[in-house]
């Protein structure tokens, strides 16, 4: 009986020690907050224009976009790939005396060269849908200048948006 108790005590202390002897956890990922203005155009299919008209929003097929993007970059080491989390708030149609709100939450990746891709939900008065975006961010010193294209296919039709703006790296 004494040997059994000794063996159980040895096993109880050996397991936690073994678990602590494994490889070290990677260092915490560095994050960078980037936010800045966005400006661009959205091209609406006939079905989207009709859907907006049903909700008393009368616009042409091309509307202006003005807004703000909140971005958080997550990266580690110099691997070149950066994970992104973005919230994009836009007001469309200001050129036509209407304000159509839009909110997108995008999750994606950016390469060291600035090419980027993201996907996420988009909410507007025309409905809720999945947005697909791609683009490139050009850097000039501390200034980042993105050029992005997004496609939002819906039951009513398709929205295609082109946005640019800037952020400052701090």
Residue map of PLM features:
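Short glycine/proline- and aromatic-enriched beta-strand/turn motifs that initiate or cap beta-hairpins
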Residues: 19-67, 167-169
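Residues that define the transmembrane beta-barrel architecture of outer-membrane proteins
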Residues: 60-66, 99-103, 124-130, 143, ...
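Transmembrane beta-strand segments that form the barrel wall of outer-membrane beta-barrel proteins
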Residues: 83-93, 114-125, 143-153
């Amino acid at each position: 009986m004494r040997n059994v108790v000794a063996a159980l005590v040895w096993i109880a202390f050996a397991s936690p020690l073994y678990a602590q002897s494994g490889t070290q956890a990677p260092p915490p990922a560095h994050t960078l907050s980037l936010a800045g203005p966005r400006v661009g155009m959205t091209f609406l299919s006939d079905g989207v224009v009709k859907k907006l008209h049903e909700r008393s929003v009368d616009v042409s097929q091309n509307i202006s976009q003005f807004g703000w993007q909140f971005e958080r970059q997550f990266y580690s080491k110099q691997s070149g790939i950066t994970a992104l989390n973005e919230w994009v708030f836009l007001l469309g149609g200001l050129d036509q005396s209407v304000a159509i709100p839009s909110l997108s939450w995008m999750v994606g990746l950016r390469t060291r060269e600035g090419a980027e891709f993201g996907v996420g939900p988009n909410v507007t008065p025309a409905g809720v849908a999945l947005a697909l975006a791609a683009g490139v961010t050009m850097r000039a010193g501390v200034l980042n200048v993105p050029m992005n294209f997004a496609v939002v296919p819906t039951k009513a039709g398709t929205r295609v948006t082109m946005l640019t703006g800037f952020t400052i790296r701090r």
